């Protein structure tokens, strides 16, 4: 099996990219191909799916990941009943450290508003992976080149549960909360509890701006 490919990115769109290596072009489905630039060189970790078509021919489908940690988490997701490769890629559009922390903490409510999740999906993933991820916390230090950032992330305050609870209490719907949190994810690392009010205000503004935009479009 291919573990990773080093090559040149010849094409990309929102769903996949084509990586050239040794005069071959590999179509790699990814959660976010746009993190790479066309015509640049890259090392991409690969998961290979092998299946048969209706003519009993064996076909190969490739999924790409920027880091080994992403690939390992993707493979963990595939062990969950009802979770396939496409759903797993959608889930990986969320911050990986945040996902792992919420799963370890069995925080169904916070997971269910993230991209790729429903309440049923969140429950299935937590039931299947929470114990495993708790036991694998130490091994992550061997799979990531930036040990200090993981340590800092795991010890920091996680504002997502408080943010979700506050927005739900204010009457906002799941899809609104999901969009706001996904837009705020870059700001959610290394925040303190006294900043939660500011985050709630920012989330409300995002939701309000979205509502105005949709109303203008309809008009």
Swiss-Prot record:
InterPro entries, A to Z: DNA_helicase_Holl-junc_RuvA_I, NA-bd_OB-fold, RuvA, RuvA_2-like, RuvA_C
CDD domains, A to Z: UBA_RuvA_C
Entry's Gene Ontology BP terms: DNA recombination; DNA repair
GO cellular component, one term: Holliday junction resolvase complex
Localization terms from the record: Cytoplasm
Residue ranges, annotated region (Flexible linker): 149-154
UniProt-recorded Gene Ontology molecular function terms: ATP binding; four-way junction DNA binding; four-way junction helicase activity
Ranges where the record places region Domain II: 67-148
Record's keyword terms, sorted: Cytoplasm, DNA damage, DNA recombination, DNA repair, DNA-binding
Region entry Domain I, spans: 1-66
Region (Domain III): 155-219
UniProt family annotation: Belongs to the RuvA family.
Domain free text: Has three domains with a flexible linker between the domains II and III and assumes an 'L' shape. Domain III is highly mobile and contacts RuvB.
Function: The RuvA-RuvB-RuvC complex processes Holliday junction (HJ) DNA during genetic recombination and DNA repair, while the RuvA-RuvB complex plays an important role in the rescue of blocked DNA replication forks via replication fork reversal (RFR). RuvA specifically binds to HJ cruciform DNA, conferring on it an open structure. The RuvB hexamer acts as an ATP-dependent pump, pulling dsDNA into and through the RuvAB complex. HJ branch migration allows RuvC to scan DNA until it finds its consensus sequence, where it cleaves and resolves the cruciform DNA.
Description of how the protein assembles with itself and partners: Homotetramer. Forms an RuvA(8)-RuvB(12)-Holliday junction (HJ) complex. HJ DNA is sandwiched between 2 RuvA tetramers; dsDNA enters through RuvA and exits via RuvB. An RuvB hexamer assembles on each DNA strand where it exits the tetramer. Each RuvB hexamer is contacted by two RuvA subunits (via domain III) on 2 adjacent RuvB subunits; this complex drives branch migration. In the full resolvosome a probable DNA-RuvA(4)-RuvB(12)-RuvC(2) complex forms which resolves the HJ.
Stated name of the protein: Holliday junction branch migration complex subunit RuvA
Organism of derivation: Malacoplasma penetrans (strain HF-2)
Phylogenetic placement of the source organism: Bacteria, Bacillati, Mycoplasmatota, Mycoplasmoidales, Mycoplasmoidaceae
């Amino acid at each position: 099996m291919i573990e990773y490919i080093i090559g040149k990115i010849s094409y990309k769109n929102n769903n996949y990219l084509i990586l050239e290596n040794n005069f071959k072009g590999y179509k790699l489905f990814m959660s976010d191909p746009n993190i790479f630039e066309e015509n640049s060189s890259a090392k991409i970790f690969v998961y290979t799916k092998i299946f048969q078509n209706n003519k009993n021919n064996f076909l190969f489908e490739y999924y790409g990941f920027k880091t080994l940690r992403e690939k390992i988490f993707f493979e963990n997701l595939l062990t969950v009943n009802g979770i396939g490769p496409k759903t797993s890629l959608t889930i990986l559009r969320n911050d990986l450290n945040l996902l792992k922390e919420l799963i370890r903490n069995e925080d169904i409510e916070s997971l269910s508003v993230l991209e790729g999740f429903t309440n049923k999906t969140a429950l299935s993933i937590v039931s299947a992976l929470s114990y495993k991820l708790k036991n694998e916390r130490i091994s992550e230090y061997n799979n990531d080149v930036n040990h200090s950032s993981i340590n800092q992330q795991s010890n920091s305050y996680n504002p997502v549960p408080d943010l979700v609870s506050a927005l739900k209490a204010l009457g906002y719907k799941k899809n609104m909360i999901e969009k706001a949190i996904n837009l705020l994810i870059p700001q959610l690392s290394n925040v303190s509890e006294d900043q939660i009010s500011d985050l709630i205000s920012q989330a409300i503004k995002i939701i309000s701006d979205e509502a105005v935009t949709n109303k203008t479009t309809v008009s």
